[in-house]
């Protein structure tokens, strides 16, 4: 049995057509089903529907053989027990700092609100900047507006939400896309099967990119 961990939303929507190229199609619509384990048209392949931030954990611990996770999630939660063989070039966005439009650069210790705590610590450590990290799980844009933080670090797609709240994107930390990740033990035990899937997905990505 080959188990693939996916999260609902943009990543799932963009991944399903790629899996279909490999003949892997869910037997019911994951967006409408309440099931978290979904069979596919291949009897020995199933999908696990999990939170985006949990995909690396499921794969690393062998609960799933493969998964699809955003690079932002992999940067934050680590991927030491994973192979990352393929950039699927889907769900593309940017991980950036942002602050109030026109606000002067704060002097001294910086207050940064984000859910990407580990990324923020590494980023500012590399700059030699002292920061206080404030962990939030949502509505990041609010933090600078009410003086909870000087800046935020968040995923930016169009930037419309930032602008609607009087903020502007500032420093680019990383360009983000979703990656195929593979459990190391699974890669050894089911090497031919998984490598064939990787190759098929790579061809699908390249074909789509050329198109």
From Swiss-Prot:
GO terms for biological process: L-histidine biosynthetic process. It comes from the Bacteria. It is an enzyme of class 2 (transferase). GO terms for cellular component: cytoplasm. Gene3D superfamilies: Periplasmic binding protein-like II. Coiled coil: none annotated. Keywords: Amino-acid biosynthesis, ATP-binding, Cytoplasm, Glycosyltransferase, Histidine biosynthesis, Nucleotide-binding, Transferase. Belongs to the ATP phosphoribosyltransferase family. Short subfamily. Catalyzes the condensation of ATP and 5-phosphoribose 1-diphosphate to form N'-(5'-phosphoribosyl)-ATP (PR-ATP). Has a crucial role in the pathway because the rate of histidine biosynthesis seems to be controlled primarily by regulation of HisG enzymatic activity. Lacks the C-terminal regulatory region which is replaced by HisZ. Heteromultimer composed of HisG and HisZ subunits. HAMAP family: HisG_Short. This is ATP phosphoribosyltransferase. It comes from Pseudomonas putida (strain GB-1).
